[in-house]
Amino acid sequence: MSTIFDYLKEVTYDSIYDRPFNELDVLALTELTYLPFDRIVPQGDTTNIEVRLSDAAELVDRTTDFIVTDQHLQLVDDLASTKRFKNIKLLNYVNEYDPDIQKQFAAMTYRLTMDVYLVVFRGTDDTLIGWKEDFHMTYMDHVPAQRRAASYLQNVMKEFPKGRFLVAGHSKGGNLATYACTYLPNHLFERVDAIYSYDAPGLNRAIIETEGYQRTSPNILHFVPQGSIVGMMLEVPEPATIVKSRAFGGFVQHDAFTWMIEKDKFVTLDQTSPDSQQTDETLKQWVRETSADERKKFFDTFFGLFLDAGITSINDLRNLKNFSKIKEIFQNAQDLDPTEREMLERLAKQLLDTRVQAWKKWQTVPRILVQMATFFKRKNAVESSSALLLEHKD
């Protein structure tokens, strides 16, 4: 089946007027926002300085890492050569990182037509502070990136008082898009036509119950792959469109480049996989059974083990030169105060026990274990066959 790249080939010569902008077009620009435009698009909420997409593509840094992949580079090249995308304007780029308040935030605005804009919030990057901020959402109603998203969206909408807006994000970016729209004043929200959330975690119940969210909810288009893990976190009351992914496993399916497409729509399924549903049940039960203070201490301690060892990003962990840091991380764990170590071990065990209970309740084995069992069964069968052949030969 097709992916987003096949769709882009299909619409190469179609303008936005020939074929209306849809969920796949929004996804393409949402993924594009992961690229580093720091020295390409002027930074600020209301710069009003535009850069054409095809021009920006020529200046993009071609270095790949955990976040920016070869597929992202292929994406920017394909968009730059496609009629409906190449003349889109990029503006109001913001990329902020503040370890003191534990904030990772990035956003950019796309001018699609004269008065139609798409505001995209970037998902979590490779910084541990960014990942830590994500887990803060399990015990904080509002995190710094969410508040920043709300101010960014309001500033952009005020800059273009006659504009109509789409708002979108993948992963944490979808969470920020929903949050920012929830806290828009009514006179601004009236100009938001749709909110696109791609495999994004939900919000805390305190936010879900606000009038702002109840007003916003009907405008949310929530897409998750069948094995979704990230998109099942926290409270996600609106029904999701379940997209078929060609990838194996929930975390790999988080990569939207693996999502299947037919014509100009996602290939959809009726329900998420048992693994996804079990993980959803596990995380929600673990949150119910632990206090906000316990979760705060757990994640502060867990991420502290890495940060104290000088590991500040996922790319640091992937760097072979930093393998010596692993020993330091384990040493940091051994050096924890006995109370901290007991808390870390207890909550980790509780999370694991909750997952095991979910397996028992569903009377299913996680797919990864089934695959491993099948592999070893086949391996043993091949070895047995080889032994018989050798014996027959003798």
Where are these predicted regions, by residue range?
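Alpha/beta hydrolase fold serine-hydrolase catalytic domain that processes acyl esters and thioesters
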Residues: 1-24, 28-117, 121-164, 185-394
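Gly/Ala-rich beta-loop-alpha elbow adjacent to hydrolase catalytic centers
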Residues: 168-173, 177
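Short glycine-enriched nucleophile-adjacent loop
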Residues: 177-186
